């Protein structure tokens, strides 16, 4: 985004509203705290590395345009809006639908957001889909279109977005020619091949082999959260990251503990036979650029990739903790929420360090657990269908907290207490719930909140403040984790659907809490001004 956009937001914040609609939109725009993105790690780069990062940014801006096409269509429609608040909020949301309000439309003339965005024909019926026998129709890297006779057909991303992808390939090829890091050069070369073939395995493996580079580039069609119809299509995005060598070194020892942590999971032995790869990375970065899917609505503060289970088995995963983004969210959102909700006596347990550890092991938890069902239903993802991402996020939430608590008991994490980890986690649930239920993350957090409340992990005192029962919270961690893993291991999608339908909702007490938070003017999320 251009800096002028953020200047416009500042002007809008001071402008008088002409009507109630403008007032509501003004509040929506201001619900995102503007964060200037910069890093001392960027200042320390060589001139050659700065050239490479500039090329990465150009490639990322193309990813941004491609995501607009995927999630909405023609960005020019939103750029042409005459209401400045509508336009500003549309730029944040990549369209006229509010990410933090279950994708409710906020621009007149637009109805509900299509579940399949632009990945499928808007007029496609389920009867057509079920009769459509193309083996590639559920590929991450195809769109579904109509042929000249009106019949459904698949089109590979490399064909649908060929013009833009060739520009990206040229930029990555130039970057590869400039880098002095062999691992980065190999990764970029393989990523170019991936964009041209829609086969990302080799580039994902090369990315995992890239261990000693001071920067990282996450680019391509990656997550499938944007496809609410089948969760089958990958959305384009880009992160440009600079490695924090000191903080990363402090995390290195935990990679070797992953197999041990897997055996410690609070579930039946037959559900934890998967052995995670030990080539996994666990590193800390400053994020200096977001584009596309990751930049829409609520912002990612940690990454766990690749998603390909073949890579998990062979190489593990890379967990990237985005420290500057994480601290921005803690300072502007988490800490103020804790002051509003948690009893004063327990506010001392809300710490930035605990937030860091909880988020870090949320990402680690994605790589653990069960990958194949135990009853012949195939992979967990296949068996869980439309529930897969909600339950995967729920698993990562609670297993992350389980692992932090376990590592504290083992003496491996020494700078926080279990009380800090648990209290910060519980307050953090509300931060995430405010993302709305348009996201799998929001649904997962709501299920966790309701489970912990019903089982006594916390209650409200006479003043309406939260009082955490740390003993009961510890019991909830184990029992909730066990329920999730068992559901995934057995591929019990019918139970998963029924459970999420009943429990991914906001009750009266939490609704009142959220009103308190909103009344205090606490931002719901952040929006970036890339100041470099």
Regions found by a protein language model. Name each.
Residues 401-498:
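Long, well-structured alpha-helical subdomains associated
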Residues 485-532:
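Extended, compositionally biased alpha-helical segments that mediate assembly or anchoring
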Residues 46, 181, 389-406:
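An active-site-proximal "capping" alpha-helix that borders the catalytic cofactor pocket
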Residues 46, 357-371, 396, 401:
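Active-site recognition of the HExxH zinc-binding catalytic motif
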Residues 157-347, 351:
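Contiguous, non-catalytic segments that form substrate-binding/exosite surfaces or channel walls
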Residues 14-16:
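C-terminal motif of bacterial Sec signal peptides marking the signal peptidase cleavage site
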Residues 370-394:
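Post-HEXXH active-site segment of zinc metalloproteases
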Residues 22-187:
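N-terminal helix-rich structural modules
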């Amino acid at each position: 985004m251009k800096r002028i956009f953020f200047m416009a937001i500042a002007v809008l914040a001071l402008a008088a509203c002409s009507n109630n609609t403008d007032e509501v939109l003004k509040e929506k725009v201001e619900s995102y705290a503007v964060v200037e993105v910069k890093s001392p790690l960027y200042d320390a780069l060589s001139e050659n590395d700065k050239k490479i990062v500039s090329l990465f940014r150009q490639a990322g801006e193309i990813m941004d345009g491609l995501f607009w096409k995927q999630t909405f269509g023609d960005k020019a429609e939103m750029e042409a809006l005459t209401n400045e608040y509508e336009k500003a909020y549309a730029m944040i949301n990549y369209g006229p639908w509010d990410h933090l309000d279950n994708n409710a439309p906020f621009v007149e003339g637009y109805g509900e957001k299509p579940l399949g965005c632009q990945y499928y024909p808007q007029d496609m019926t389920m009867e057509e889909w079920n009769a459509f026998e193309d083996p590639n129709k559920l590929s991450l890297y195809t769109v579904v279109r109509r042929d000249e006779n009106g019949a459904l057909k698949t089109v590979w991303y490399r064909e649908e977005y060929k013009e833009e992808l060739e520009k990206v390939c040229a930029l990555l090829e130039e970057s590869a020619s400039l880098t002095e890091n062999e691992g980065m050069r190999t990764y970029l070369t393989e990523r170019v091949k991936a964009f041209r073939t829609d086969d990302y395995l080799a580039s994902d493996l090369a990315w995992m082999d890239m261990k000693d580079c001071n920067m990282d580039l996450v680019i391509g069609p990656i997550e499938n959260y944007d496809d609410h119809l089948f969760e089958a299509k990958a959305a384009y995005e880009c992160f440009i990251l600079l490695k924090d060598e000191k903080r990363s070194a402090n995390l290195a020892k935990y990679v070797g503990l992953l197999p041990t942590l897997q055996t410690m999971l609070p579930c039946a032995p037959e559900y934890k036979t998967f052995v995670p790869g030990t080539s996994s990375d666990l590193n800390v970065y400053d994020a200096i650029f977001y584009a596309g899917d990751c930049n829409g609505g609520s912002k990612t503060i940690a990454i766990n990739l690749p998603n390909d289970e073949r890579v998990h088995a062979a190489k593990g995963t890379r967990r990237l903790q985005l420290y500057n983004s994480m601290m921005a969210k803690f300072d502007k959102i988490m800490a103020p929420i804790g002051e509003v909700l948690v009893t004063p006596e327990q506010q001392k347990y809300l710490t930035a360090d605990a937030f860091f550890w909880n988020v870090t092991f949320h990402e680690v938890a994605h790589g653990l657990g069960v990958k194949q069902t135990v009853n012949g239903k195939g992979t967990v993802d296949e068996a869980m269908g439309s529930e897969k991402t909600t339950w995967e996020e729920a698993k990562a939430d609670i297993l992350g907290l389980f692992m932090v608590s376990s590592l504290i008991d083992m003496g491996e994490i020494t700078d926080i207490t279990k009380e800090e980890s648990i209290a910060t986690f519980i307050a953090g649930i509300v931060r995430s719930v405010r993302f709305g239920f348009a996201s799998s993350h929001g649904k997962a957090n709501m299920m966790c909140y309701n489970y912990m409340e019903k089982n006594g992990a916390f209650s409200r005192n006479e003043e309406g403040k939260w009082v955490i029962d740390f003993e009961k919270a510890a019991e909830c961690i184990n029992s909730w984790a066990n329920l999730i893993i068992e559901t995934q291991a057995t591929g019990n999608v019918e139970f998963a659907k029924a459970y999420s339908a009943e429990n991914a909702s906001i009750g009266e007490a939490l609704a009142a809490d959220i009103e308190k938070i909103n009344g205090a003017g606490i931002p719901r999320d952040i929006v970036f001004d890339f100041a470099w």
